[in-house]
Design a protein with these regions (language model features):
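Residue-level signal for mature regions of secreted extracellular proteins and peptides
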Residues: 14-17
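Rhodanese-like catalytic fold shared by cysteine-dependent sulfurtransferases
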Residues: 2-9, 19-38, 43, 50, ...
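Structural scaffold elements adjacent to functional motifs in cytosolic proteins
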Residues: 52-54
Length: 132
């Protein structure tokens, strides 16, 4: 009788442990990295192959934006990202006015499969060159 119980226990563990481990993993849930304005500025100064996304409205963008920034309002990210941002591994820096919309945009980019997204808050928080 003891041998049957051992065999049953071994079979049970053999089939249940792999499923238990899968349930404990994070599933590879990707996320964006939140960085400071100073860190973003340093990346802009030292890197060349990056894209800057301005997640504000057209009117805000026209009032002044960071050089090289592409306007994609946060509510249009899902519709426009794949067409305008074909390289999902490229460094993407995201900002808005105060940081709320840039977080939403960064989260959406990650959901779409972008792997190198850094959100640096609002344009009002840093000392960036502004162009019109």
């Amino acid at each position: 009788m003891l041998k049957i119980n051992k065999r049953f226990l071994i079979a049970l563990l053999t089939f249940t442990l792999p499923f238990g481990c899968v349930g404990c993993s994070d599933g590879g849930s990707a996320t964006y990295e939140q960085i400071s304005g100073a860190e973003a500025k340093a990346l802009m100064d030292s890197e060349s192959g990056y894209i800057i996304i301005d997640a504000r409205t057209q009117e805000e963008y026209d009032e002044g934006h960071i050089p090289r920034a592409i306007l994609i309002p946060e509510y249009e990210i899902a519709d426009r990202a794949e067409k305008e941002l074909p390289d999902k591994d490229q460094l993407i820096l995201v900002y808005c006015r105060s940081g709320r919309r840039s977080k939403i945009a960064a989260e959406e980019l990650v959901k779409l499969g972008y792997t190198n997204v850094k959100e640096f808050g609002g344009i009002i928080d840093g000392e960036y060159e502004i162009v019109k």
